[in-house]
Each structure stands twice: as structure tokens, then as C-alpha cells.
Amino acid sequence: NKTPLQVANKPNIDKIAALGRCGMLHTIPAGYAPGSEIANMSVMGYNVPEVFEGRGSLEAASMGVDIAQDEMAMRCNLICIENGIIKNHSAGHISNEEAEELILFLQQELGNELVSFYPGVSYRHLLKVKGGNKNLKCTPPHDVPGTPSADVMIKAVDVEANETADL
């Protein structure tokens, strides 16, 4: 009893298998939650514990937005909340045009010398904070659908970060 794959004449696959190696590539360093941003940086050879500062820095780089030493970049997601519960993490698959309008409105109403909003793609945007404290606990919305939004708002890890968390 053999499977179709075992019976098939597959010299190229057999050669690749004979010359290749099997193994496990660990792309998530100890202490980090599994996520594409961590895995991708690890695969590209970055020392994640030394350089990773969150999705915001990746978002800024992809948008060509410079982040100074005294600034922090935060990913700013548009999401859907219904009756206080996170309905979905993508703002109902919002279009780029609708999203840009919302982010530019936020910049007009809330932006100042310390806080700036930058439109990105669909629900993924950038918030740049000058002089903010990075000791924050941020929960990615895609990890918590169905959760009360109040339970997963940004939280300060220590007292010094309270002002930044309250933004």
C-alpha cells in the first residue's frame, strides 16, 4: 500500500529532498509574542531584542517617515467597535480613501507639536509622539476580537509612562 506521492516519478523533488536538510527555524526569540513583525525581522537577521520597538517603527519606515531619537512611532489602527466590543480589527476593510480622510481629520483635531498622525494603507496608520515614554503595553486589535475595547486600551507599564498612555 503506497500513496500516490510514493508511487509518482518525481526525480526533481527526490533530488531536492536528498540534497536538502530538514529542521526547525525558530523565528521568535524567547519572551516575544509570535507575530509577523518579530518573525520577519528575525529571518532578515536583525537582533530583535536589540532593535525592535514595535510595529510603529516598521510602519514609519514603510511610509518614509523619519523618527528622531526623542520621538516614538506607534501603529495606529482603525477598528470597528460596536457597543463597546471590538467587532473587527480592520475597520470593516476600510478603503484607503476613507481611512485617509479619517486620519487627516484626527491630525487636524488632535495633532500638535507633540502628536502627529500619518495616513497609511487601509486600517494601518502611524502615530508619532515627540518625547513619549515607550514603557507601554499595547494590544494588537487583531489579537482580541470580541473583547471590550476598554479592557485593551494602551496601558502604562510604569508610572513614568502614564502621561503617554493617557494621550
Predicted regions and their residues:
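Active-site nucleophile/metal-coordination loop of metallo-enzymes that catalyze phosphate/sulfate
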Residues: 2-112, 122
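Glycine-rich, mobile lid/loop segments that gate access to catalytic sites or pores
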Residues: 90-167
